[in-house]
A protein has these predicted regions:
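P-loop NTPase catalytic cores that bind/hydrolyze ATP
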Residues: 243, 255-278, 372-373, 434
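Surface-exposed loop/edge segments in extracytoplasmic proteins
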Residues: 137-142, 392-399, 573
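Catalytic core of nucleotide-sugar-dependent glycosyltransferases
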Residues: 214-218, 224-254, 270, 276-301
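Surface-exposed amphipathic alpha-helices with a cationic face
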Residues: 76, 246, 552-556
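Basic, ligand-binding patches in group-transfer machinery
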Residues: 278-281, 286-530, 553
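Nucleotide-sugar donor-binding/catalytic module of glycosyltransferases
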Residues: 1-244, 264, 513
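Active-site and donor-binding regions of nucleotide-sugar-utilizing enzymes
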Residues: 369, 406-411, 435-437, 520-521, ...
Length: 577
């Protein structure tokens, strides 16, 4: 390290009314196995907090006076706070950590080893982002880390490997000092900052086993709505975000490189997928709509098609918005693959999110399947017919309902995400294999992959997930529903209960296995039906709550029902419910 580099790492933490989480964040840095007091500096920048944040900051500074710098300033936003901390940096590598996120304890040592091997080749290294609290999975861009080895990504060769967040990055201090955060920008300011660093160098590193825990709060949706309730998000942010990066790419490369096009696709999907907001008048909204279209026009269609994060609904919507309407003449189906302008959109035989089966029942020796199909495929082929095939010989057409569900307001207009269908299939008593197929207007056929929703007793992964409907035994096998009347129903039930138990045990789900055993035992005793009712796991106050309250208030009408409302213990509605 040079004389200016007193530490290996400097961590800049902007603080604003963060008393609830700040200790977790700071403690995660102090706990680093590389050694905090010798190798790490923390710069706490209080951006005019009105809670106990300053008190906490001062306590940490008092405890670690050689490692912690405390700066107090008037409220000016997160970019202002980050910029204020930059002159105090004394580390070789810098992390801008949000005041409610935290690092795993071995991250800094892993990042240090990686940087020391690649110092002359990169300016920035990114780590994995794992959500916690209201959501517990990894960031949609986590596919970049599927390779187990740390590596350097050349952005001209791996256009899909975009980096959006600064909090999960470590940046060389000399690169940090070359740039500043735009203090007038309230959304995407960190993406602009790191994108200039990445595009300037043309590559960046990924440390595959270093994990940043990114807090996803249950009220994040309300924060997003708050952002969308401000005119600035519509009128100023697009130019500050997309316009700035396009200008930078043109100056650096003479073109809008495909890496940046993928970044535009990733962020613009949320704007194209979000329709009219009454914060704008009609004229302002039309201007905003044209602005979004202008920036989407910098994106080649193939970037939309090849995106690894867009759903098919997103791809069709963005292509339609960009071109004015979907050019159906450029759509084709080749070996179950949907093609658009000779680029592959999706393999219908592999992808499971197009056709869903929601309910299964048997009435009068007739199997009734009810489900839904995603409407993007109907927008591609309005004349499409859905049918279920039995034993490769007989076809039974599905009947679509007159109504769709999941209405979504978008820049292309109102969309209905799903269309319901029902199909009735006569049962013979002999073994029958049943699977769905679509037929296009030109006679082309494609076998569809089924997805069973939460109300279905079948499961594609668990071989023990089967059901009886009267005398009929029903299971899932080889992307088909298998129906038959077993010669010994009890023997069949026991065999598949054992399979279900072994599957759960193999996958270390003994908690679920025990519940399964209890459920089997309870069948031999008279009991009430247990109804589990819910809205979302973190929020109540919707149709589920109203149904639950109705049943509770009319218990005499439901004497054999024991209702329970399911909700997270961390939900703000938990105590009320």
């Amino acid at each position: 390290m040079s004389k200016k580099e007193k530490y290996i790492f400097s961590v800049v933490i902007p603080v604003y009314n963060a008393e609830k989480y700040l200790s977790e964040t700071v403690d995660s840095v102090i706990a680093q196995d590389i050694g905090f007091e010798k190798h790490i500096q923390i710069i706490l920048v209080d951006d005019g907090s009105k809670d106990r944040s300053e008190e906490l900051c001062l306590k940490y500074r008092e405890k670690y006076p050689d490692n912690i710098v405390y700066i107090s300033k008037e409220n000016g936003g997160v970019s202002s706070a980050r910029n204020q901390g930059i002159p105090y940096i004394e580390g070789r590598y810098v992390n801008f950590l949000d005041s409610d996120d935290k690092w795993e304890s071995d991250v800094f040592s892993k990042v240090y080893r990686f940087f020391e091997k690649t110092y002359d080749r990169i300016d920035l290294a990114a780590c994995r982002m794992r959500f916690f609290e209201a959501r517990t999975d990894y960031h949609p861009l986590d596919f970049r880390f599927k390779n187990r080895n740390d590596r350097i990504i050349n952005i001209l060769n791996e256009e899909n490997c975009i980096q959006m967040h600064v909090t999960s990055c470590f940046i060389k201090a000399e690169a940090v000092r070359k740039w500043t955060f735009n203090e007038e920008q309230n959304y995407g300011e960190d993406t602009v900052y790191i994108s200039r660093i990445i595009m300037d160098r043309g590559r960046y590193g990924v440390v595959t086993k270093a994990v940043c825990n990114y807090r996803k709060r249950g009220n994040d949706s309300s924060a997003v709505q708050g952002m969308r309730g401000k005119k600035k998000w519509y009128i100023e942010t697009p130019d500050q975000f997309y316009g700035e990066l396009i200008r930078f790419s043109m100056e650096r490369y003479g073109t809008v490189i495909r890496y940046l096009q993928q970044l535009l696709v990733y962020d613009l999907q949320y704007r194209v997928g979000f329709g009219y907001n009454h914060v704008l008048n009609k004229e302002e909204f039309e201007t905003y709509r044209q602005t979004v279209h202008k920036y989407l026009s910098y994106v080649d269609n193939s970037c939309i098609i090849r995106s690894k994060t867009l759903t098919m609904d997103d791809k069709i919507r963005m292509l339609s918005f960009k071109e004015g309407s979907l050019n159906r003449e450029q759509l084709s189906l080749r070996d179950n693959i949907v093609m658009y302008q000779d680029s592959a959109l999706v393999n219908l035989a592999d992808r499971g999110a197009t056709l869903m089966v929601n309910f299964l029942s048997v009435e009068n020796d007739t199997l009734i399947l009810e489900g839904c199909i995603r409407t993007w495929i109907l927008s591609c082929w309005p004349e499409l017919q859905l049918k279920y095939v039995v034993d490769e010989q007989k076809y039974y057409p599905a009947v679509f309902n007159d109504y769709d569900i999941e209405k979504k307001e978008t820049l292309t207009g109102d969309e209905w995400q799903l269309r319901f269908y029902r199909v009735r299939i006569p049962l013979s008593g002999k073994q029958q294999q049943i699977y769905p197929m679509i037929e296009l207007g030109n006679g082309e056929e494609c076998r569809m992959k089924m997805v069973f929703t939460k109300f279905m007793p079948l499961n594609a992964l668990n071989p023990g997930a089967v059901c009886f409907r009267g005398k009929y035994f029903i299971r899932y096998a080889a992307n088909a529903i298998d129906v038959r009347i077993p010669s010994n129903a009890m023997k069949t039930k026991i065999a598949y209960e054992i399979k279900a138990f072994n599957y759960l045990r193999k996958n270390e789900r003994m908690d679920a296995a025990k519940l399964r055993i209890q459920a089997v035992c309870r069948r031999f005793f008279k009991k009430k039906q247990i109804w589990l009712i819910s809205d979302r796991d973190y929020v109540a106050n919707d149709n589920g709550e109203h149904l639950f309250r109705y049943i509770c208030e009319h218990r005499k009408e439901y004497p054999d029902v024991e209702p329970y409302f399911v909700i997270s213990g961390e939900s703000p509605d938990y105590e009320r419910m």
